[in-house]
C-alpha cells in the first residue's frame, strides 16, 4: 500500500477576511487610494501597490486635485501599451462622493487612435501631443512610446507646469539606453513638472535599478502591500505557495 503524498507548502499565509479591500470612504476611495490621496501634494510621488488595488483610480483623484487645487495646467497619463489606456476612460467619481468627475475628451486618449506606436507612423500622435499642450484641455492619455517620441520632438520645456503620471513604472530604468528613464531624469533635474510613478513591482528582471538613488530620494513613497490587499478580501481564507519535484512523465 502506497502512502498518500504529503504536500507541505513553502509559504502558508492565513488572512482575516476583513472586507476592507472593497470598502470605500465618503469620497469613494478604497484604502490604497485614500492612502495615496493623502500624499497628493507631493511633487514627486511613487505608488507601489499590487494589481487590482485601484492605482488607476487613485491617480484620477490625485490628478484632479493637482489640476483644480495645485495650479498645474494639464495632466499627461503615460501607459506602456494601448490596451491599458482603457483604465483611464471617463469615470463619474461624483457618483461615489468625490467632488469632480474624471473626463478625457475622445481626441486626447491617443491609446484609442489608429496606427502603431513606432517612429515611422507615430508622427501624427506626436503632433496630437503638441496640439494638446497648446489647448486648454486638462487630460491626455498616451503610450510610453508616444510620450518618448513627443519629448524628443518637443523638448522637456514644453511640459513645464504639468503632471506626468507613468503607469507600470518598472518599464523605466536608470540605464542610459532607456530613453524614457533618461527623459524622466531630465524632467527631475529641470524640476518644473510633477511626477507620479505607479507600479505593482518596483524591480526589474535585468537587475538594473529603476531610478538612481539620488533621483529616487526625491520621491515620496506610498506602499500598499500584497498582504494588505489579500487580507482585505472577504472570501480568501488562506494562501499556500509551494514547489514540487516530479519523477517520470508529468501527466502521471
Predicted stretch roles:
Residues 144-146, 155-197, 201:
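SF2 helicase catalytic motif II
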Residues 4-48:
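Conserved pre-motif I regulatory segment
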Residues 82-85, 145-148, 170-171, 200-205, ...:
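Conserved nucleotide-binding/hydrolysis micro-motifs of P-loop NTPases
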Residues 42-63:
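Walker A/P-loop
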Residues 194, 205-252:
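Interdomain helical connector at the RecA1-RecA2 junction of SF1/SF2 helicase-like NTPases
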Residues 56-61, 66-67, 71-103, 146:
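Conserved Walker A/P-loop ATP-binding site and its immediately adjacent core
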Residues 41, 71-72, 134-136, 158-160, ...:
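Short loop/turn elements that form and flank the Walker-type P-loop nucleotide-binding site
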Residues 97-149:
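Inter-Walker segment of RecA-like/P-loop motor cores
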